[in-house]
Regions:
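Bacterial signal peptide processing site
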Residues: 11-14
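Mature extracytoplasmic or organellar-lumen-exposed domains after removal of signal/transit peptides
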Residues: 16-381
Length: 381
């Protein structure tokens, strides 16, 4: 078993005390032999996101693969209210996705929530009625090539992809880097003093600050089996469709070692909270902001380049599938964090890029190449 440790100086009335912060091999933290880690709410929301992803492909939201057509009201209820989902365990929990989308305490922008609402409405009003029709420029329907078939709106957007990839940034990343690891959550009210003095949340075995960090952890690892006792720098297996899935892809391609950097930062940051070493906590938070944001940058580039490659091969459906994913990841760029609590791309910059991607049938490769260059340059990837 491997451990990482830092020594930090803490002020006292008499002298400087050296505090050792040791990160365990896994994310297992105990108090009197009982786990202090809890992120069940995040697991619920990630599972709800998977259900909506299925519904936006006219598949039963339980993941069975059966064809099922939903009304706008039904999908809206899943998104806004956490209700109407076939898996009863995901209903009536009080956990809702929409209210956690673009809602970070450091950078909330509730106007972005309407973009997700609009995608749901577009899917039901335009894509579903044309499910078996042939798609063409300006005409929604089914688009098929030698590699796949997809269902698109009149602009060529595959909405299950634009929605879920946008949610990766709008909920998962935003809740981590712009909310739970931020001082506006960590140190809100009396949380810092309570944590220092070992005052636990009412009826719980953890402090409020410990729990906030764990909630951030859950938005990345919440669908991994045995996440608290597994080496998450090497065990990269999960059933979900959100941020962790794409971290594993980047680990295996663009940036080997990124999974370890992120897992180590989560562990050491949590250990620092237990030790009351808040400078160490904040240093690990900055690592998480930058490294997790890179996942969004890498995948934005990958899918833009993938579109151009697939189009040159004559596979329009496959290309539009890739560009739909790219569209969603570009939506997600506004939720990145450069370590100084600024996004790598502002909402205005993102909206300008999305405008150039509004019609896949007429998209310009020179615009995509320019976007790729901007993302690589700004994010140093």
């Amino acid at each position: 078993m491997f451990f990482s440790a830092l020594f930090v100086s803490c002020d006292s009335d008499d002298d400087d005390q050296l505090v050792e912060v040791v990160a365990p091999a896994t994310y297992e933290f105990l108090r009197e032999g009982v786990s202090t880690v809890s992120f069940s709410g995040q697991t619920t929301r990630l599972n709800q996101a998977d259900a909506i992803f299925n519904a936006l492909n006219s598949k039963a939201d339980d993941g069975s693969g059966a064809t099922k057509f939903y009304t706008e009201a039904q999908i809206d209820a899943m998104f806004a209210d956490g209700s109407g989902i076939m898996n009863a365990a995901l209903n009536g929990t009080g956990k809702k996705i929409r209210s956690k989308t673009s809602a970070g305490c450091a950078a909330g922008n509730s106007a972005t929530q309407a973009q997700f609402d609009d995608q749901i409405a577009d899917f039901v009003a335009n894509v579903v009625p044309a499910w078996t029709a042939d798609a063409s420029s300006g005409v929604p329907g089914k688009l098929t090539d030698a590699t796949r078939s997809i269902h698109v709106n009149g602009m060529g957007h595959e909405i299950d992809q634009t929605f879920i990839k946008g949610l990766i940034g709008g909920m998962c990343l935003d809740q981590i880097v712009n909310n739970y690891i931020q001082p506006c959550q960590m140190d809100s009210g009396t949380r810092r003093d309570d944590n220092t003095n070992g005052i636990l949340s009412s009826g719980k075995n953890y402090t409020d600050m410990e729990h906030k960090w764990d909630e951030a952890f859950g938005y990345l690892y919440g669908q991994v089996d045995n996440a608290k006792t597994t080496d998450l720098s090497t065990n990269l297996s999960s059933t979900g469709t959100t941020l962790f899935k794409y971290l594993t892809k980047i680990e295996g391609s663009n940036d080997p070692g990124i999974a370890k950097r992120i897992f180590d930062a989560f562990k050491l940051g949590r250990a620092a909270i237990v030790a009351g070493a808040y400078d160490v906590r904040d240093a690990q938070a900055n690592i998480l902001k930058i490294q997790l944001s890179k996942v969004i940058g890498y995948k934005s580039v990958d899918y833009l380049e993938g579109y151009m490659s697939k189009m040159s091969a004559g596979n329009t459906a496959d290309a539009f599938h890739a560009l739909s994913e790219g569209y969603g990841f570009i939506m997600s760029l506004q939720f990145t964090n450069d370590g100084n609590d600024a996004p790598y791309f502002t909402k205005a910059e993102v909206d300008a890029m999305l405008s150039k991607l509004s019609n896949f049938w007429t998209v310009n490769n020179s615009d995509l190449t320019s976007m790729v260059s901007q993302i690589k340059s700004k994010m140093s990837i």
